[in-house]
């Protein structure tokens, strides 16, 4: 069976480079004040281009991921998505909008809840409906959950209980240490996933099949160049839309956390679709790699970067979760440990995760 990341065409789809290129041009002209910044039509067009650029970047990352194989391919996709996430968060933090000290926390928390409850819930429900019971490598899930639980607790829970900084915030030295610990721990996990215990993270069918190949050697080179173009488009469009997004949420009277949920939802949409497709093909191990990899990268990469921005520029960075979100995180990690603790899943576990995700969305809009 071909890998789920198999590239079936030697031709680069037109949309995958036209949208990022057009997005770069529109964003650059607007930021240079050639086009009107407050135009509603332009902002709506930019939002559509941002979504398209996210899909394009993940598409090109998938081409590269197919060349390197699993589990490295899942890592590449997760890092690509996290770069986009960091770019959007950084743009909002530097925009000067009210509440921007909380956007990193809200986005990272939303990303964890979306992938661990929304995406994994859909994977288990749809995959279980088609294949009844699905299996995956228990060692892989255990290793990832151990790191994820530690990083989430240190980054999102501990700030509520330290006394050296402001409420829900680390002091500068604490923030530096937590950032370094996150980078090191995530780096060790990547070493285990790609070198020391690589076999833990490989699907049985992937191990038995030869690596995916492309019809032309030009594909990876073109994909690499277009991936850079797509990421640049995302960064420029994020800078353009950062202030209007904050203003829209405020005008609608919604909590600031909705900004984080929106960012995480847009960024994770393509990868979520890929994960669900893998589950439908009875490749649950690939889905688990993508889901847990995204959650780990979201904390292990995003937190150190925003911590560096905060310390370097002297900006406040609130990371501690509100009480209701703290309960939701603990519940998610607890249920996730049970769900992924046997190596086999059914529709029931997926339904539980979707129920938690529904409550998370409710609390995001109505705390």
UniProtKB/Swiss-Prot annotation:
Chief location category: membrane
Cite the GO molecular-function annotations of the record. Answer: potassium:proton antiporter activity; sodium:proton antiporter activity
- Is Transport a UniProt keyword of this protein? yes
Query: Transmembrane segments in this chain: where?
Result: 12-32, 39-59, 74-94, 108-128, 143-163, 172-192, 221-241, 249-269, 291-311, 318-338, 347-367
- Pfam families in the cross-refs: Na_Ca_ex (PF01699)
Gene Ontology CC entries for this record:
plasma membrane
List keywords of the entry alphabetically.
Cell membrane, Ion transport, Membrane, Plasmid, Transmembrane, Transmembrane helix, Transport
- Tell me if Cell membrane is a UniProt keyword of this record: yes
Q: Where in the cell is it found?
A: Cell membrane
Membrane-related topology note: Multi-pass membrane protein
Q: According to its UniProt record, which protein family does this protein belong to?
A: Belongs to the Ca(2+):cation antiporter (CaCA) (TC 2.A.19) family.
Q: What does this protein do?
A: Possible cation transporter.
NCBIfam families per record: caca2
What protein name does the entry list? Putative ionic transporter y4hA
According to its UniProt entry, this protein's organism is Sinorhizobium fredii (strain NBRC 101917 / NGR234)
Organismal lineage: Bacteria, Pseudomonadati, Pseudomonadota, Alphaproteobacteria, Hyphomicrobiales
